[in-house]
């Protein structure tokens, strides 16, 4: 009976067909995965700079006699004349930045005479983003990481616990982007507590005092905010509100009281106290909510949240246009307010169809805005609020019981500062929330968090720079004569330039790009962090902030995050996530109407827009007409789960990989793995080194082709046409759209070094005569094969123990992997040397190096530079350099020798560039940068030479390997092929893994991949298993059966030492494995002589400092337990910090005399000095009658004989 076919053969990339078992009817194709970087930077260049310049100009002098204006639209960005590819290559070679110059046209206007003059001024150099979404800063590729921060706005919270007092509080925080924070709160646990307000970190004061400062009376407060006990308690404690005082007196006293708290220590004047609050909250220059903050505030303070599911306690009457006509009632009293009715009422207020409430009716006038009315007269009209009365319950409505007044701010507000209507609406919301009207905010929800991308971060730096420059310009205008003022001589562009330079060089958000492999490069650009300026601190961030949130679905990957102290603080964008104009993350869905899915256009929604809507998974059953065929559907609604009929579904996911990042989406059978191991798998894929021979996985997820398509390392055709020439260095395509048949040439990269020392080499995947379309891939890069990502290798793996060598996740590999270069990779090391000028003399490039052996100089040419192609090892000279010693560097012994022999000792020392310790390889390139050739170098540097050494690294014991499921280990043994267990047909295994590594880790995905991989290899086909919609267990068993393999996937394996079958069958199959960047060659290290710490006199630690191995507390216990007293004494004295002891030991070893006794370790002396600092005199009592003072530790470094001997060795024989 023929097997039922559960799969389709689909194309992945241009050259690969795979079996696809997924159930999803239609999956949305991926758009540019680097759009978050590119779109943000384009917005900055094309829109934000112009708008910001308009904000800061004109700049007027203090006497208003002269002003500098910006000529609108005159901004000009001068980009490099050469192509981006050439400019980037040159920047990397010369160690400079790839940038464009910003010019603006400024106009000087003398107000008295009307005289006008113009100047074009350079404002700054702006680093340009490359087409791959990165920046070249000082020759290095960097990425600006996007930041996830709390959005400006008003945030309400009920029963939050105070960290200091442990009491429960209700509170509201009003957070601007720039300006003073406001916090209003009261204690929930006490009925007698009053509501207090706090501005910034100043002392809190009564909320009623704050309201009194605007002119609110006790009566108007009750009308607007209700008769709650909390408000009554607050008013009863307010001593300013006296019965015999008029409102003017009350207001004056309240303003002075607030001034004393907020401006503590400053002298009170009537004008200063009157304008304090208006300057703090209503002045846009000092208080800025930003466009996003205003949007958030208007959304929060709308009536919608509070009136939904309540009953109207009044008629909603439309404005009467014709006074002769009777007013129309939109909704009568007693109407139950549904979602749609609430939206209609809110919109009616916004469109002005319902009459607003004027705060003047409550005794509040526009003078609350103080002096700001002079500069912004429009504020006079900003005195309106909206509001309606509601019943909370049906019972209250039927009995005409307690009514609640719900107030919203002016819905037409667009100002970036607070308005009096905002303050009234915020306080009304606060008191209503105490009555459970409205909803509190979740600070960890993406409803309240936004992304700050590269464009906005750069704009912030430009703002700071322009602010400093504005101040500097105004000072210069005041101090110079008007006739001498020109826009050019008073514009100090260093203020802006330094700000941008500092940001790119030292900001936490400007990061060295991870270029280990193409996936790590794309992931770095899609990374988002909660750390950095204005963000969280990793030391104080709580669990709640780090945890996965329901609103992350489709926006932030719940899997990919670091494992260390940054867990949950550094995240990655989900596959389809986008950022809207306000910075909120969106995810796409297909609209569903009456159970029919519209696949024509995806709808992008923010977390807030998902409220009160239902969402189904992409894998539900849908027929060819788009109709949902399941009777009941599991849906996500209000971030919870429910079961509904198809007609109740509003939207459907666009893909099964919607919730995961690119790295997590490339793990097959992700749904069968524990989340912790999936996290490790995602992270380790980014550490896989590109291999010499790339190989795409037999079992993929389908995203590999998408990553290849969007990787900046792969070349894509920019025209439709025909390939007319191909070789290893270039591809030529004849443009079919061009009448003249113009030819487009694409240069291929070869052996280009990355930031991490891995290699980018492009190879063509098209042939002569191939027809290509615009956007088609025409080359593979490192870690790609035939248009798919290929980070590792498909190897034959068996799960079995082998003489204890795979204990604790250790890995046993076959020698075949070494001989056949299966896991061989190439790494490039760049070594640089500079030639400087100094008073003592100049550094010289030479092949004639004093005291250098012929062996170490064997690869140098006549100029002293290593030849390209040379095989070099540790200690070989790459560039010969001699430097002047200078008189101050000549020791007394050398001066004495000079006197004895009347001979001028060579004044030059060998400072050549040598191959680093533990390094070897082939010299593949030498770059010479010098002033003579017109290269820009730092002062005092005449020339700089860079040497590139490539090293071929085969897999060896100590290297780290991993699969895609978090299954990692270190190679413990490389076995000859004949010693590896083999299958019935004689095929030896490539790798042996420990089966005990699977059950407790719960990453079963690796076992499923193993079996399906084996079937793929036998059948000669490739499979695709998308995340959450992959190949099922039954399909794997069918594939194994089709390949004539056991349905269990277990096989008979033979022991090569005996030739007998191993007792039990074991799981054998093909698994995709990586070699990670944690290689033993980078870690192997030993020390014989090296530097010591100045304080403790102990050897330094770490390979980079040629340090020693720490012999710590526990190691000391180990030797103590064995009674190895002499070894222990030697380690803790001579080999560590006994200065005199180690000098004496050196003398004894060189002279062959008896070894000395060890002395007092320096660390003990450091302790003694610390005790002396506390006034405690420490003495050693060896015998009852003797007292020994601790040594002063002032030792002579060497005696004269030793110094003479050392100096004489430095003098070459030819000089005598």
Curated annotation (Swiss-Prot):
Keywords: DNA-directed RNA polymerase, Nucleotidyltransferase, Transcription, Transferase
A Pfam family recorded for this sequence: RNA_pol_Rpb2_1
Database matches in Gene3D superfamilies: 2.40.50.100, 2.40.50.150, 3.90.1100.10, DNA-directed RNA polymerase, beta subunit, external 1 domain (2.30.150.10), DNA-directed RNA polymerase, subunit 2, domain 6 (2.40.270.10), RNA polymerase alpha subunit dimerisation domain (3.90.1800.10), RNA polymerase Rpb2, domain 2 (3.90.1110.10)
CDD domains according to UniProt: RNA_pol_B_RPB2 (cd00653)
GO cellular component, one term: DNA-directed RNA polymerase complex
Ranges annotated as biased composition (Polar residues): 1190-1216
Record-stated family: Belongs to the RNA polymerase beta chain family.
UniProt function note: DNA-dependent RNA polymerase catalyzes the transcription of DNA into RNA using the four ribonucleoside triphosphates as substrates.
Protein name: DNA-directed RNA polymerase subunit beta
Organism: Mycoplasmopsis pulmonis (strain UAB CTIP) (Mycoplasma pulmonis)
